[in-house]
């Protein structure tokens, strides 16, 4: 070129397979710097962890780390006992729960996950952290977001009535599931409750029915389901505050959605198909078992109670069959005892009692509208005597009573014994007694 300028040709940057170019070298240097900061930071972290004790309140005004160590071994009476760590602050704080001090150190280190999770964590001024009875150690980090924030931390171990109520609910669902699945009251109340709680989920489900298959709108619907569940959880957490500030809107929502849910349930009606009822029964029983297991804080006791409930519910028929088999075996092995015969006095008393009872039943029937009086009168020989009997008179005449006493009473028995002792050779005596017997028989007829 003019002026004698010389141009030097340099090799192309990044021509080799291991070359990164100018931008690549900058990215590598940035990663190396971040890694060095990460290593140096992790090496120099020194935590000042506060030890938490039960029923002891700690007041703090700076971001601190604290740990609770559980040294008590759970007993059988701790099945409904809950350990909670409560963080109550004057302003919003961010609380993070981890397992031990090493996890606390990891929280202090820089990482992409910690950076994004810090934005996703809820910021509350009243936080409850549940600690398992078998958990040896639980640590937490409290981060204040504003200056002049004061907060307190307390650990409590107490009987939780909510766990007991959940256990009773599970017990009721398991043992009364077959009755509840056929109850109209349970059907309408459950339908209204589901409609009130999950109305947004129901709307999304109905909208999904009208969407074409393989449509991108399903991605939005899946996000809508997740967002709806998040809203339901958020509402339940702040239900008391919502009721205090917006009770008019909440009451209007409950009444409107409850009425619409009742209308839908009334339109379709309770379940009538036996298979559908069985499916609902099994669902309620399974839900009851889950409630019973989750409400008991000691796992092996919870499992034992679930097994006992299953055996009690489903083994009543085998136990009844075993009992019947045992009774049959006992009857087969024992000696047969002949029935005791009644004495003459017992036989006479039993006959009188049963006769009196049958006569009273006959009077009641004759006085009832079911008895056809004219047809009955046409079939008897003495209507007046029958009418007197129905009105309460005795059913026998004095002559019939005397004949019965002579025939079946004590005197007739003695007379029959005397007659049997006489010899058959006395023909004249037997002939003289024969007309008397004929006369008595003719009188009875």
Curated annotation (Swiss-Prot):
Region spans: B: 336-405
- A Pfam family of the record is NEMP
Q: What is this protein called?
A: Nuclear envelope integral membrane protein 1
Q: Which PANTHER family match?
A: AT07567P-RELATED, NUCLEAR ENVELOPE INTEGRAL MEMBRANE PROTEIN 1
Q: How does it assemble?
A: Homooligomer. Interacts with RAN-GTP. Interacts with EMD.
Compartments in which it is found: Nucleus inner membrane; Nucleus envelope
List where the protein spans the membrane: 161-181, 186-206, 216-236, 245-265, 289-309
GO BP term, pick one = erythrocyte enucleation
Q: Give the Acidic residues compositional bias ranges.
A: 418-430
Q: Where is this region: Required for nuclear localization?
A: 336-445
Notes on the domains = The transmembrane domains are required and sufficient for its oligomerization.
The chain's coiled-coil residues are none
Q: Which UniProt keywords apply?
A: Erythrocyte maturation, Glycoprotein, Membrane, Nucleus, Phosphoprotein, Signal, Transmembrane, Transmembrane helix
Provide the glycosylation site positions.
125
The cellular component terms of Gene Ontology attached to this UniProt record, alphabetical and capped at eight, are: nuclear envelope; nuclear inner membrane
Instruction: Give the residue ranges for region: Disordered.
Output: 418-445
- Give the bilayer topology: Multi-pass membrane protein
Which family is this protein grouped under? Answer: Belongs to the NEMP family.
Q: Where is the signal peptide?
A: 1-44
What's this chain's function? Answer: Together with EMD, contributes to nuclear envelope stiffness in germ cells. Required for female fertility. Essential for normal erythropoiesis. Required for efficient nuclear envelope opening and enucleation during the late stages of erythroblast maturation.
Return the annotated region ranges for A.
186-297
Q: Report the PTM annotation.
A: Phosphorylation may regulate its interaction with RAN-GTP.
- Per the record, the major location class is nucleus
- Residues with PTM Phosphoserine: 368, 424-425
């Amino acid at each position: 070129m003019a002026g004698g300028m010389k141009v030097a040709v340099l090799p192309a940057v990044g021509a080799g397979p291991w070359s990164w170019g100018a931008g690549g070298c900058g990215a590598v240097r940035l990663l190396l710097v971040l890694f060095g900061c990460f290593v140096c930071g992790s090496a120099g972290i020194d935590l000042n962890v506060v030890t938490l004790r039960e029923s002891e309140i700690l007041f703090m005004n700076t971001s601190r780390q604290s740990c609770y160590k559980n040294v008590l071994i759970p007993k059988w009476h701790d099945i409904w006992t809950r350990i909670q760590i409560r963080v109550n602050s004057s302003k919003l704080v961010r609380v993070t729960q981890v397992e031990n001090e090493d996890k606390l150190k990891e929280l202090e280190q820089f990482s992409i996950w910690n950076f994004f999770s810090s934005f996703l964590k809820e910021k509350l001024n009243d936080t409850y952290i549940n600690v398992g009875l078998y958990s040896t150690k639980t640590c937490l980090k409290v981060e204040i977001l504003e200056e002049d924030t004061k907060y307190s931390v307390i650990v409590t171990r107490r009987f939780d009535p909510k766990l007991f109520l959940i256990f009773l609910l599970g017990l009721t669902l398991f043992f009364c599931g077959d009755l509840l699945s056929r109850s109209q009251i349970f059907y309408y109340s459950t339908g209204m409750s589901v409609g009130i709680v999950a109305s947004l989920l129901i709307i999304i489900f109905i909208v999904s029915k009208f969407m074409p298959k393989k449509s991108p709108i399903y991605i939005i619907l899946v996000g809508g389901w997740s967002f709806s569940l998040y809203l339901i959880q958020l509402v339940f957490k702040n239900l008391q505050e919502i009721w205090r500030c917006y009770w008019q809107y909440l009451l209007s929502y409950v009444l409107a959605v409850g009425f619409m849910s009742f209308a839908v349930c009334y339109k379709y009606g309770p379940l009538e198909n036996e298979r559908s009822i069985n499916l609902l029964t099994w669902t309620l029983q399974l839900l009851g078992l889950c409630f019973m297991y989750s409400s008991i804080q000691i796992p092996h006791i919870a499992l034992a109670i679930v097994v006992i409930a299953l055996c009690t519910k489903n083994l009543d028929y085998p136990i009844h069959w075993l009992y019947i088999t045992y009774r049959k075996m006992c009857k087969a092995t024992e000696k047969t005892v002949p029935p005791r015969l009644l004495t003459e006095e017992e036989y006479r008393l039993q006959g009188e009692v049963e006769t009196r009872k049958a006569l009273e039943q006959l009077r009641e029937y004759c006085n009832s509208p079911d008895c056809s009086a004219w047809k009955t009168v046409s079939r008897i020989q003495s209507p007046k005597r029958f009418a007197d009997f129905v009105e309460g008179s005795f059913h026998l005449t004095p002559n019939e009573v005397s004949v019965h006493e002579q025939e079946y009473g004590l005197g007739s028995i003695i007379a029959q014994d005397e007659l049997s002792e006489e010899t058959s050779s006395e023909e004249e005596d037997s002939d003289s007694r024969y007309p008397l017997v004929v006369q008595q028989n003719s009188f009875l007829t």
